Regions:
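Enriched but not universal
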Residues: 1-27, 31, 375-378
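Short glycine/serine- and acidic-residue-enriched loop/turn motifs that recur at repeat junctions
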Residues: 31-50, 84-101, 134-151, 183-201, ...
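Conserved core positions of repeat-based scaffolds
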Residues: 32, 70-73, 82, 120-123, ...
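Surface loop/turn motifs at the tips and blade-to-blade linkers of beta-strand repeat domains
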Residues: 55-56, 105-106, 155-156, 206-207, ...
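Tandem repeat domain/solenoid detector
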Residues: 59-63, 76-79, 88, 101, ...
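Blade-level signature of beta-propeller repeat domains, shared across WD40, Kelch, NHL, RCC1
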Residues: 347, 363-378
Length: 378
């Protein structure tokens, strides 16, 4: 199992604001598909789905994040909901019982952003506080220890956290002042970007810069549009043209037009400000979308289109949304449970459209399941 952030989850601010609700007549509908172990699709069953299935009847979903056989989401009212596998308490309900349908986490209504990786959950509230729960084997919750938590626990006392990215065995976050922090976790390949391979279980600042804007697994974009990478690199996932690990951030090329990135395990997908999509890293199942299964150690453009809006990576598969609201999928995984949503269990090495809808808003890939939000008139 790759030690990776499961799904996207690493949205820019423009994707996690109330601007999603264009007006009072538009609602956000949640769909899921793929592997349904422990009810992680949230449809009240454990039946795998190879095509999108609506989760309940509500139209107030704001952001979703998919992990290892579990799911977490935020509604427009700021409440937090989770479902699926819960062996490590990763659902945040104070127990280890699985849930087959969405259940509210506590009673707070001020959750802003959620990022779950493998079996570790991290979230930020509107007051800028950071919270963690679930598996903590590597100290990735940033709580100063390696004890699991089954309820959300505040990370430190700071109230200036802006965004967070959980990769399961390590995590990072950006503060409002633009500083980048590694929260903790295993660091045997320099994943914490501290210039060493020392294990940590509490937040430590990465360098001294104050211009970090967007974070994913071992990848980050600065406010100047430059892309930086660090950590494991056995599959060329750092995009530096080699397979050498890095324990400190290194710039990827010289371009200054990177907009957002989704890195998962050993695969990376990124969108530039011109709307083009670029991929690199592991490609054993065609997850780079380049028409083959050859790894790449430098960014390569996916097709020739310039209308990509958001991309989310799961385990050996990729989901992406275009500006026209269409949803596309490729890859599939060593085991394909229908996570591409194409009505079959076939792997694809080039983008294939999922259905015919043109109202997809956000997509998140997990271990072998996918969550996505559409909007519709209500």
């Amino acid at each position: 199992m790759p030690d990776a952030q499961l799904g996207d989850k690493d949205l820019d601010d423009e994707y996690i604001t109330d601007a999603w609700l264009v007006d009072q007549h538009v609602g956000n509908v949640l769909f899921s598909w793929g592997d349904n172990y422990a009810g992680c699709l949230g449809d009240g069953t454990t039946t795998d789905r190879s095509s999108p299935v609506q989760v309940g009847t509500l139209v107030n979903w704001k952001q979703v994040s998919a992990g290892y056989q579990y799911s977490v989401a935020i509604k427009n009212d700021g409440t937090l909901w989770s479902w699926g596998w819960n062996f490590f308490g990763q659902l945040g309900h104070g127990d280890t019982a699985n849930r087959g349908s969405p259940v509210q986490v506590g009673s707070d209504s001020n959750w802003k952003q959620i990022s779950i990786g493998y079996r570790t959950s991290l979230a930020i509230k509107t007051n800028g506080t950071l919270w963690g729960w679930g598996e903590n084997d590597g100290g990735a919750l940033g709580l100063g220890d390696t004890a699991n938590r089954s309820n959300p626990v505040q990370v430190g006392t700071e109230t200036n956290w802006k965004s967070v990215f959980s990769s399961g065995y390590y995590a990072w976050a950006i503060k409002n002042d633009g500083t980048l922090w590694s929260l903790g976790g295993f660091n045997n390949q320099g994943q914490l970007a501290q210039g060493d391979t020392t294990f940590r279980s509490s937040p430590v600042q990465v360098g001294s810069l104050t211009n970090w804007r967007h974070i994913s697994e071992g990848m980050a974009i600065k406010t100047d549009g430059t892309l930086w990478a660090w950590g494991a690199n056995s599959q060329g996932q750092l995009g530096l043209g080699d397979t050498v690990d890095r324990s400190s951030p290194v710039q990827v090329g010289t371009l200054t037009n990177w907009k957002n990135i989704s890195a998962y395990g050993s695969t990376c997908q990124a969108i530039k400000t011109d709307g083009t999509l670029w991929a690199w890293g592991a490609n054993s199942q065609g997850q780079l979308g380049l028409g083959d299964r050859t790894n790449r150690s430098s960014p390569v453009q996916v097709g020739t289109l310039s209308n990509w809006k958001q991309v989310g990576i799961g385990v050996q598969f990729t989901m992406a949304i275009k500006n026209d609201g269409t949803l596309w999928a490729w890859g599939g995984g060593f085991i394909n449970n229908g996570q591409l949503g194409l009505g079959n269990t076939v792997n694809y090495s080039s983008p294939v459209q999922v259905g015919s809808l043109t109202n997809w808003k956000q997509v998140a890939g997990g271990d072998s399941h996918t969550l996505a939000i559409t909007y519709r008139e209500i």
